[in-house]
Amino acid sequence: MGWRMRPLAPTADRGWVKELWAAALPPTWPPLPAGIAMLGDGLVAEAGAGPVGLAAVDIAGSIPLILVHPAHQRRGIGTGLLAAALDKLRAAGAAEVTAASGGDGYIWPGVPLDLAAGVRFFATRGWNRGHDTLDLVADLARYRPRATAGQRAASAGISLAPTTGADAVGVLAFEAATFPSWVRWFGAGDRDVLIARDGSGSIAGTLLFEGPGADTVLAPILGPAAGVIGCVGVAPDWQGRGIGTALVTRASQLLGQAGTRTCHISWTTRESFYRRAGYRPWRRYAMFSHPPGGGS
């Protein structure tokens, strides 16, 4: 049976994309409505009476999601959608295309390692596999950090406190100078900020946190009392003194006191660091990219 391709209609197609997701992915990855809602562009494969596949596109340079219904797999549909999505992104001027993340928004950082067929799909089509990343979680209702978690930072004269309105300019200046790729996340103003300051009052580190009821695409999996911690950063001159661990531990305590249950930390390679702060690995991802002008 032949198939044809058409543009994604983000709103009109939302219902069947949810059905396709449920059919193509295992129960460990149930449909994520907020993730589906963020798909604003892409290509749809149709066969017979309706759609059977999707390649979402983020013109900023990523393919956030690609799915083919199990009944229509191994017919070249996924390969065709991927090639067309790459062509669309190259035509828009993308210097590099990444799988899953890399655009303005993302459902997951990379291709989930527990979706082995998805990992093979990109690996066998000329995509470059970089480092793996992981997400971690902690049950804050049972969170008991080590008694020494904040001692090293405290002995170095570091104090921790959530931001007030007067801190906003200083926080953004710190991010711009130290972690420029995070400026947009801190500038959004939709999450709380925890600051580590040295004895002179200068910012030595920051992180973002939100919960319970955090606005996260993974809420259907994490639960209604979910929280998130992200963008944990310590100034280079202060690294290695326990400040990062102190920040994560304190943010976790604040979230737990507010009623957060599962706290999620996404997109990191620092497994041992977060384990020391009381978190455990949850999901792992392979990071894939495709150079411009390469074969698909």
Language-model segments: residues:
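A conserved beta-strand-loop-helix scaffold within acyl/acetyltransferase catalytic domains
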Residues: A24-G42, G53-G61, F179-V234
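Conserved acetyl-CoA-binding loop-helix of GNAT-fold acetyltransferases
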Residues: R74-A91, C231-V234, G240-Q253, Q257, ...
